């Protein structure tokens, strides 16, 4: 662990107790998309949900995700160049000012050499900067209203799955409202949220923006396991937060994150789509997850204070 990493960890660790690191899956965990598209979400309700309506909602999300990926996040150029996280090529980035850089005219191609790796690193830096600014600089008010409406329609159709998942993240984070109505995480927050998705990196970042998760998931905490596997991503996360006070818990619906968590002896919370399950949204709470932490790491004052 280098000095910079040690300093960053020092700002996250206090004398108040352990720091919980929540390692999330995305689809069918923090959001619903795949199960809308293939109908499995609606089918789990045994006829009380309109399957076709769910598919329509999922297709609308797909359309918006791909458009924003292509229009603002270079996805047409980098689709075949997926990396596990945005900083993976930082060593090739020379820090060039990108404010007037012509991304469409730099002859970027598959990064098999240092020059194209640098060009890809430029794109990753630009993506990170755009992600941190949110959608407002790129989307007009009419389009934003349409996205808000789609979010609300989806939340209603899914019985508040989206807003309940977001509320979970908010309860585990110190969130401050700014004068312009936006939210920001206080640096003193004792919990960390990390996303490890089996989807491609750029679309996953765009999903975070569209599903209002970017307040809680910074770009450096979003990983794509599609090429390297979830176990490797989990190992990187464990290495990043290499301090006795950090406690890890994986939350997802798939076998791969379960196996990866077991390999590292982390607690794992299995998300279940079934309507009568408590391990879904709404239903899952920080209090419930605190029992999983306690089972592996023992009780703490922080656990007993969860509501």
Swiss-Prot record:
InterPro entries membership: EYA, EYA_dom, EYA_dom_sf, HAD-like_sf
Consequence the record notes for mutating residue 197 to A: Reduces phosphatase activity 55-fold
Sections of the chain in a coiled coil: none
Which residue ranges are recorded for the region named Necessary for optimum phosphatase activity? 1-15
Give the Gene Ontology MF terms in alphabetical order: metal ion binding; protein tyrosine phosphatase activity, metal-dependent
Instruction: Locate the active site.
Output: 25 (nucleophile), 27 (proton donor)
Q: Quick one: effect of changing residue 27 to A/N?
A: Reduces phosphatase activity 30-fold
Query: Outcome of mutating residue 29 to A, per the record?
Result: Reduces phosphatase activity 45-fold
Membership in a protein family: Belongs to the HAD-like hydrolase superfamily. EYA family.
Report the protein name in the record: Protein phosphatase EYA
The organism of origin for this protein: Arabidopsis thaliana (Mouse-ear cress)
């Amino acid at each position: 662990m280098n000095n910079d990493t040690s300093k960053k960890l020092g700002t996250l660790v206090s004398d108040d107790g352990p720091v919980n690191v929540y390692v999330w899956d995305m689809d069918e965990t923090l959001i619903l998309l795949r199960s809308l598209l293939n109908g499995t979400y609606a089918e789990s309700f045994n006829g009380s949900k309109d399957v076709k309506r769910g598919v329509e909602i999922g297709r609308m999300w797909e359309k918006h995700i791909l458009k924003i990926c292509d229009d603002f996040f270079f996805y047409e150029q980098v689709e075949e160049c997926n990396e596990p996280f945005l900083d993976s090529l930082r060593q090739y980035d020379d820090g060039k000012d990108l404010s007037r850089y012509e991304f469409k005219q730099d002859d970027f191609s598959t990064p098999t050499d240092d020059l194209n790796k640098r060009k890809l690193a430029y794109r990753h830096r630009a993506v990170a900067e755009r992600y941190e600014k949110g959608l407002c600089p790129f989307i007009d008010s009419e389009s934003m209203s349409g996205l808000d409406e789609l979010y609300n329609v989806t939340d209603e159709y899914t019985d508040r799955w989206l807003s309940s998942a977001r509320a979970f993240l908010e309860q585990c984070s110190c969130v401050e409202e700014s004068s312009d109505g936006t939210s920001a995480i206080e640096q003193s927050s004792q919990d960390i949220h990390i996303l490890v998705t089996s989807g491609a990196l750029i679309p996953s970042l765009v999903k975070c923006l569209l599903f209002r998760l970017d307040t809680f998931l910074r770009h450096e905490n979003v990983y794509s396991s599609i090429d390297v596997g979830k176990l490797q991503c989990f190992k990187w996360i464990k290495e990043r937060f290499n301090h006795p006070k950090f406690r890890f818990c994986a939350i997802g619906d798939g076998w791969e994150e379960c196996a990866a968590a077991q390999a590292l002896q982390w607690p794992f919370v299995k998300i279940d789509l079934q309507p009568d399950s408590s391990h879904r949204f709404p239903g899952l709470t920080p209090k419930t997850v605190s029992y999983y932490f306690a089972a592996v790491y023992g009780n703490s004052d922080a656990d007993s204070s969860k509501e």
